[in-house]
Amino acid sequence: MSEEPEPAAGTFRAEARDWLRAHVPAGPHPSVDTAEGFEWHRAWERELAAARLSVVSWPAAYGGRDVSLLDWLAFEDEYYAAAAPVRVGQNGIFLLGPTLLGHGSSEQQARLLPPMARADEIWAQAWSEPDAGSDLAAIRARAERADGGWLLSGTKTWSSRAAFADKAFGLFRCDPQAQRHRGLIYLMFSLRADGVTVRPIRQLGGGTGFAEIFLDEVFVPDADVIGEPGDGWRIAMSTAGHERGLSLRSPGRFTAAAERLTGLWRRTAGAADTAGAACTTGPAGTAGLAGPAGAAGTAGPVGGAGPAGTATADRVADAWIAARAYRLHTYGTAARLAAGGTLGAEASLGKVFWSELDVALHETALDLLGPQAEIAGLDGPDGRWLGGYLFALAGPIYAGTNEIQRTVIAERLLGLPR
């Protein structure tokens, strides 16, 4: 298929591009991991919602535009190209929202999706526990039957957005006698409810994007159960498919980063090679990489003339090519889904690819910057690479470790024995 499918290259893309150019605030943007920054991003989400651009692929009744999956990818391309703010509502918009559309009741959809789209309710994930991370089926937090609902007890950890979010969704054990993949229930609950304690987790960069959630007999009504008790695992795997596959890691994120990386290479290393550099042109008219053809034996910055410079230029090129390859893969997956296909174990393949690509992009950028990256400050243009690198390191761990994903690939895609 072509890199830019026709449905994703029409008037909607142009409309989104024009709106984003007119409305995206100049950077640097506040950190989403502080109370003030969190509310700043909530206000941005509300601006998107007012333009009906916060959940473009959702039904119009819930604040969306009913656009195709390919048009959604086009919007994501433009969003990242415009250097727009981080989506503070991503857990709801990209994970819980699609889960409710696929498995929730009509009452739940009507009650929960509109405030989610407007950022009136921002959601946290409540999956991992101190003794159950990628092995999600090992969870111990329990849901016990009560009159009209359930009582939740236990601990969740590494809950993204939980420090400042309004509500959370997650998996709990409702039948301790059942096999570990059974007896699970998918529940939603308020982080302001009686019995809930949230303790922020400070990260490498100083932010608190994750938190622990302590639950002490927290009441959740039956209306906030997704699906049936005992069927939680199947529904959770639907959510995980969105996290590992299309929804959280749209290709626009990586193509935009790859373009920034090539620009950084020209600004730092490429400057040393100006006298002898040859410029090539990349696919679809995109500017390619300047060749590292400096004077032999001349010392220069990382990536400059000589063998070391050639190696760095190769890494930049490899990352750029990988970002384009992921883009093609994702558009292909979207076309297959649009034709009635499903997102299965291949989501694990995509998760391994994008998480390792993210690390490669940021590692290469830091090598180009050298010590400057450590003193630039996280809020500056070069500091974005350091902050991005610290977060990218978690990519092979969250959403199911890459070791787990490779096991899924081996068993379910390749048919290898356990």
What would you call each of these model-derived segments?
Residues 1-88, 111, 115, 247-248, ...:
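Amphipathic, small/basic residue-rich leader segments at the start of a protein or domain
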